[in-house]
Design a protein with these regions (language model features):
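N-terminal DNA-binding recognition helix of tyrosine site-specific recombinases/integrases
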Residues: 64-65, 95-134, 187
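Basic, Lys/Arg- and aromatic-enriched nucleic-acid-binding interface segment
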Residues: 103, 118, 129-188, 192
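Basic/aromatic-enriched alpha-helical hairpins
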Residues: 21-24, 39-97, 101, 114-115
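Short, charged phosphate-coordinating catalytic segments
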Residues: 114-125, 179-216
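Conserved tyrosine-mediated DNA breakage-rejoining catalytic core shared by Y-recombinases
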Residues: 193-253
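Catalytic-site neighborhood detector that most strongly recognizes the C-terminal catalytic loop/helix
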Residues: 210-212, 328-353
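Short, surface-exposed polybasic/aromatic micro-patch for ligand or macromolecular engagement
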Residues: 1-28, 234
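Short, basic (Lys/Arg/His-rich) helix/loop patches that form interaction surfaces
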Residues: 163-169, 257-267, 275-278, 282-333, ...
């Protein structure tokens, strides 16, 4: 303890009291570890995001990367910038992390420290004081077009199989949904949440989606349930799309079948039903799984159909890029180009086009 000198006894008393309060606060800070603080930050983060699916992912990251790591038992206030940088680099290298995986993993420690700074329990967030050399990250493996989209011949055969299935078994409403979405390119969560009021004058409004939500049980495990929420994945996801005539006809066939079965077709009624219940995203993907198996091609689900439709739109020189992105429900050009622009030609078609283009 440093010497304290004051002229008045009352001032000396206050100074001594302030000193011991400062020491007590410092001692309390030294007791804060990530293991002790994580539950408090987790509840704060849940209130901030109100997204149980995201919070389950966070909890999974905690169990995978933090729970058995000695850093969570070290006093946070004692961790230096160099300590944290070395820890982060070791995590990246030992787990062969991509850049995206690292930033997802680091959310817990970075934002926990931010919250401690806000609370006044940490003077500065040292985790925000360093950068990671990009060469440490494992490059993400690019997906081949054959894994991501239905090439032209595959799409043609897929349509034939789905149409035959729906014509022979009209109760297989998922077959109609597969056909319709090849011209819409919706997220599967948007597709299964469509209601009749969304379809008007040849256009379709996208404004809700199916969402898997999670409840954390007292023992720390998670229980899933499905619900429909009145919003899309992002604000860009709320959009109005033109319905081509062939899909409009299919919608009417679905409506006719629903009425024949005695199902409601009121404005608030769901379009795609099975046994008078809304079909789910998993149900749609089961149709794709069956069709791909019948075709003898790599397994691709609704997202492959979405990529296929959006790639076709992007390939059309008469459709503006911004219009294509609006159709997709995206605002970021990089995301759209990287994830929704693929070649749909077979190797033989590519060779033929190259011969035409590059022959001397």
């Amino acid at each position: 303890m440093r010497p304290i000198a004051k002229r008045k006894f009352e001032d000396l008393e206050k100074a001594i009291l302030a000193y011991y309060e400062e020491q007590e606060q410092l001692n309390n800070r030294r007791k804060i570890t990530l293991r002790k603080f994580y539950p408090e930050w987790f509840q704060y983060k849940w209130q901030e995001t109100n997204n149980s699916n995201y919070m389950k992912h966070i909890d999974g990251e905690w169990k995978r990367y933090y729970l058995d790591d000695e850093i969570i038992d070290q006093p946070i206030i004692d961790l230096t910038t160099l300590d944290l940088k070395n820890w982060a680099r070791n995590k990246i290298v030992s787990n062969h992390m991509t850049k995206k995986q690292y930033y997802n993993m680091a959310i817990i420690i970075r934002q926990s420290f931010d919250y401690l700074v806000e609370l006044g329990d940490l003077p500065v967030n040292h985790f925000a004081e360093f950068n990671i050399n990009a060469s440490l990250f494992t490059p993400p493996k690019p997906k081949e077009a054959a894994e991501s989209v239905f090439i032209e011949d595959e799409e043609k055969k897929l349509k034939q199989i789905a149409l035959k299935d729906f014509e022979e078994h009209p109760e297989h409403i998922g077959a109609a949904a597969v056909l319709i979405n090849l011209s819409l390119g919706l997220r599967v969560s948007e597709l299964v949440a469509l209601q009749w009021k969304d379809l008007k004058d040849g256009y379709l409004q996208i404004r809700r989606m199916e969402q898997k939500q999670w409840e954390q049980l007292p023992d720390g495990t998670w229980k899933a349930y499905l619900t429909v929420v009145d919003h899309t994945k992002s604000t860009a996801g709320t959009r109005t799309l033109y319905v081509v005539s062939s899909s409009a006809a299919l919608f009417e066939q679905v409506r006719a079948f629903n009425l024949r079965m005695g199902y409601d077709c009121e404005p608030d009624s769901y379009i795609f039903l099975h046994d008078n219940n809304r079909i789910t995203a998993n149900s749609i993907d089961s149709y794709y799984e069956r069709y791909c198996k019948m075709l003898g091609i790599a397994k691709k689900g609704n997202h492959g159909a979405r990529r296929t439709a959006l790639t076709k739109i992007a390939d059309n020189p008469n459709i503006n890029l911004k219009d294509a992105m609006q159709w997709a429900g995206h605002r970021d050009v990089k995301t759209f180009i990287n994830h929704y622009c693929y070649s749909r030609y077979s190797d033989e078609q590519k060779k033929a086009e190259l011969e035409k283009t590059l022959t001397l």
